[in-house]
Amino acid sequence: MTYRPTIFRVERETVGTMENEIAPIVERELRASPDSIEQIEEGLLHETYEISCDGEEYVLQLSSEGDEGEADALRRGLNCYVMLQDTEVPVPAIVTEEIRAFDRGWYSLVEKLPGKTGKLDISPRKVRNAARYLAKIHDVRSFETSGWVRFEDREPSIRPFQDGSLRRWILRTVEETSTTLGGGGIESAGSALERVFEREGAALPDEFAPVFCHNDFTPDNVLFENEEVVGILDFDRAHASHAQRDLVKAANGFWMHDPGAEWDVQTTFYEGYREVGELDGSFASNEPLYRVETLAWTVAGLLELDELSAYEKEFYTEKLLAAIDRIEDVSP
């Protein structure tokens, strides 16, 4: 009940045009020809390749020419890796310290980390360990305002949300999400979402200390070896935000990779986070709102990609309505 990733192996004799484009990049950066090129298709924002060269492995990401949003995301992700090099957060070592131009856009090159992503293989231990590292990410940097992370001379700066605050940004996206749910065959959940945030949206926190947030912390972006975290990937969507929201969104993301688990994925994630990070008393009232908002946003994204079957639509309708009922249960 989540993205269905596929990986296409590109052999040297069939690489053709792709090799003609990528090999020169590799030769320029590594001063050697690639031994193999493997294209990765996992719903990634960028065109991504795993490169083997002289016994070492690398990851090359490309953004399309003319797509400034994609180039900004590539730049943000690479700069986040640079910022995190000397922290407890395990990120890839950098080959290109800034994104570089090629014939049809921009690229970045980093060393490939060991381990495998969680994907559809999560466990209580993996979930706890991942949550601990999310707490470490939140401890990297604090900011004076919330918004999108940008970099100027390697230093992070913030472009405030266009709506003026995280709360107003959430309320606007909830309106868009409810419309998407309704148009995608999840009408009852879309209508209930709109109603509950019209009534309870003012309770969303507007006063908090913004911290560095991954904003896409899912099993797809966490590497494990023997259930231990050995790498964290893809900071392209990083922003300065409320740690509690990033935590809840991440817990939803891990739950969605095994929604039929007989153990409580979200609670386990929160417990792991608390082993490293702090959650004050406001979490009990904020969590139900953030859970509904971030879950609905993710489901809407899957609908837009036509990724949900009729059964999955019914399943997520039930889960969204149950999550909305939790808001009503905790509301004064």
Residue ranges and their predicted role:
Residues L44-S52, L60, F197-R245:
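Active-site acidic catalytic loop and adjacent metal/ATP-binding pocket
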Residues S282-Y290:
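Alpha-helical scaffolds flanking conserved acidic
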Residues L109-L120, R172-E176, L295-Y311:
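A glycine-centered beta->alpha junction motif in the catalytic cores
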Residues R245-E278, R291-L308:
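Active-site activation/catalytic loop segments of kinase-like enzymes and analogous catalytic loops
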Residues I40-R167, G182-G190:
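ATP-binding pocket architecture of kinase catalytic cores
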Residues V15-S33, S142-N215, E328-S331:
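An alpha-helical support segment within catalytic cores of ATP-dependent transferases
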Residues V26-D35, D86-P90, G277:
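Short secondary-structure junctions
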Residues I7-E11, T298-P332:
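ATP/Mg2+ or Mg2+-diphosphate-binding catalytic cores
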